[in-house]
Amino acid sequence: MELELDLLTGLQLLSEYCPRVTPNAPPRRASVAVIIAFKESQDFSNPKWPQCIPITSVPYVLLIQRSFRDTDRWSGHMALPGGTRSLTDKSDIQTAHRETLEEVGIDLRKEHAHFVGALDERVITSNWGQFPLLLLSSFVFILPYMPSLRLQESEVFSAQWYPLADLLLPECQTRIQIDSSRALKKTYPRFIKTLFHLAVGNLMYSAIRLEFDPSSATYSLPPYQRPFLRGITHSIFVDLFIFLSPSSARHCLCWSLPYFQHYDLRFIASFFTQFYRLRLHQVYPRGNWVFTCLNGYYPYLKLTLLVGFLFRLFLVYLLFLIISAYYKS
């Protein structure tokens, strides 16, 4: 299957798109900037230069690795420039401007940056969608060249311009293990979380394996510590490729639903979700696709845990009966 990245058409569609606003959103808000640029400087003397980008020009996107902090929920993760909206910010896009300037030193109000459009808002949740944390807005910008970066070390460990099309390569699509006990509240005792993890195992989530530039600080990390593109940032690119790469979006090539590490739970979940998965495959992905799919999927995971627990109890009881009958005979 040929994966096409139609940048010009995608940017045009995105510029005409009216992003959906989330009703009853949590009060805490944050914004990120998806910044696309080119190694070969474009002719920005023409005000309509984004419509005249040569087909041979290779688009890059700016990715950052967050600094390592114990207090940060997303410590060390791959991300996009951005952060929480402050009281002085008059709008969500102003938050993206301010945070980008602070974190990587790019002034999006200068640098000949062109604002393309916004993706759908998404509510970031925890505990398998139970608790809303914040509302995230994503804004897409395109620059005619790659400006120099000035990293805020307290927030950003490293940054790299990454080929946008490489995020679609089949060999870069992978799965990573995420501790299933993260579905529990933080107030639960540690031994409860440990028992839950032993019983349930990990959840296998979609992710993208990245190739880091040798000049990047991330490259200096041991291979097992180098991060994947996953989670929230991954979901933003899934939405972006709905516009830029319809072929990959149609077949959900860069994201799919998570599954359990343990085979018995995986089988039970597959049984309960077979019609749900079929419905998803019959519709074309739309805005906020990852979180929409997960919000409908998490109830099936909870049902799987209940049925799986009862099934395992039944097996233990059956084993007990067999052993008892053996010793009696």
UniProtKB/Swiss-Prot annotation:
It is a multi-pass membrane protein. Its main location: membrane. The keyword Membrane applies. GO terms for cellular component: endoplasmic reticulum; Golgi apparatus; membrane. GO terms for molecular function: coenzyme A diphosphatase activity. PROSITE patterns: NUDIX. It comes from the Eukaryota. The chain crosses the membrane at residues 123-143, 227-247, 303-323. Keywords: Membrane, Transmembrane, Transmembrane helix. Disulfide bonds: none annotated. It is found in: Membrane. SUPFAM superfamilies: Nudix (SSF55811). Pfam families: NUDIX. InterPro entries: CoAse (IPR045121), NUDIX_hydrolase-like_dom_sf (IPR015797), NUDIX_hydrolase_dom (IPR000086). Residues 27-185 form the Nudix hydrolase domain. This is Uncharacterized protein C14C4.10c.
